[in-house]
Amino acid sequence: MATYAVGDLQGCLEPLQCLLEQVAFDPARDRLWLVGDLVNRGPQSLETLRYLYSIRDSLVCVLGNHDLHLLAVWRNVERLKKSDTLREILEAPDCEELLQWLRQQKLMHYDEARNIAMVHAGIAPQWSLKKAQKCAAEVEEALRDDNLFDPFLDGMYGNDPAKWDSDLKGVTRLRVITNYFTRMRFCTSDGKLDLKSKEGLDTAPPGYAPWFSHKERKTRDLKIIFGHWAALEGHCNEPGIFALDSGCVWGGAMTLLNVDSGVRLTCDCDAQGRTAALSPDPLPAPAKR
């Protein structure tokens, strides 16, 4: 049995299928981990969701900001944007079945045997593993509880508060937790977020740094797989941290990681998120701990 992790799909099914074919992925035997942003911007959001649902017993997903946005639009608490490619899902006869499944997915996955976590954007540097798990569970409960679902989605959007405080309550508390897990790139060492900067590692505002680079980060003994940050092109040069968003939907590539060996495979994509070429990753696998 092999376990593979793949970066942001964003509705690009063709490159995913190309990668899985190359590693002879067998859902009866292997496991597939996905870092979130399963849908949106790409040309095959509905087909992607249907495929993932068909292999759900072999799948571990964490939710990304685009997945949460889809749920919010579905529940009529947010409107479609011009750049969204979600309408086909919302009009599909199996929309209810697919999105009821989607709302059951995790915000954070932790594999104790491997001591490795998977999230969409990152883990707040001031959180321990135990604290991160507890915070993720709070949002997961809100997503799965019919009485909490719509109020959470309605209050989910926004950049404030910019920093975690254990005294936060209600939807404000859930919003900052969600922003850490699904939107974070740069922050201060005590977790104050900058949610505007989206470029490479050297573009941090003064006083800020990539979330994973803070020396005080409490999860330094934990290996972490994440996506979300396309400008990193799948590499962050941090031991034990595996960046997998390589910008497929923007004409970059989709990246697959063998979770145990660290070997990567990339599928180059065109500007429409379709397969262009397949190649082994030219960079060495990230260092293991």
Swiss-Prot record:
GO molecular function annotation: bis(5'-nucleosyl)-tetraphosphatase (symmetrical) activity
Catalytic activities: P(1),P(4)-bis(5'-adenosyl) tetraphosphate + H2O = 2 ADP + 2 H(+)
Keyword line: Hydrolase
EC number: 3.6.1.41
Alphabetical list of CDD domains matching this protein: MPP_ApaH (cd07422)
Pfam families cross-referenced by the UniProt entry: Metallophos
Family: Belongs to the Ap4A hydrolase family.
Protein task: Hydrolyzes diadenosine 5',5'''-P1,P4-tetraphosphate to yield ADP.
Protein name: Bis(5'-nucleosyl)-tetraphosphatase, symmetrical
Organism: Pseudomonas fluorescens (strain ATCC BAA-477 / NRRL B-23932 / Pf-5)
